[in-house]
């Protein structure tokens, strides 16, 4: 729903959240910070997997 749309929009703006941003989002969406952190980690992993990157270090 609305939370998911907000998370996706935030992810499009930046794949990595600052601690301040994560805290603000958690408050705004009434989720805990761990949930948001994990959602972002999973989203990054899905994109990496979809792009066929075999070695995570290849991105750096």
From Swiss-Prot:
GO process annotations (BP): neuron differentiation
DNA-binding region: 1-41
Name of the protein in its database record: Homeobox protein engrailed-like
One term of GO molecular function: RNA polymerase II cis-regulatory region sequence-specific DNA binding
Entry-linked InterPro entries: Engrailed_Homeobox_TFs, HD, HD_metazoa, Homeobox_CS, Homeodomain-like_sf
Organism of this sequence: Lampetra planeri (Brook lamprey)
Ranges in coiled-coil conformation: none
The keyword Disulfide bond is assigned to this record: no
Any Gene Ontology CC annotation: nucleus
Family in the record: Belongs to the engrailed homeobox family.
Subcellular locations according to the entry: Nucleus
One Pfam family cited in the UniProt record for this chain: Homeodomain
Cysteine pairs bridged by disulfides in the record: none
Record key words, sorted: Developmental protein, DNA-binding, Homeobox, Nucleus
């Amino acid at each position: 729903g609305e939370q998911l749309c907000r998370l996706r929009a935030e992810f499009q703006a930046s794949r990595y959240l600052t601690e301040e941003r994560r805290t603000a989002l958690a408050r705004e969406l009434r989720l805990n910070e761990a949930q948001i952190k994990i959602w972002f980690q999973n989203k990054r992993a899905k994109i990496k997997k979809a792009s066929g990157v075999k070695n995570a270090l290849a991105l750096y």
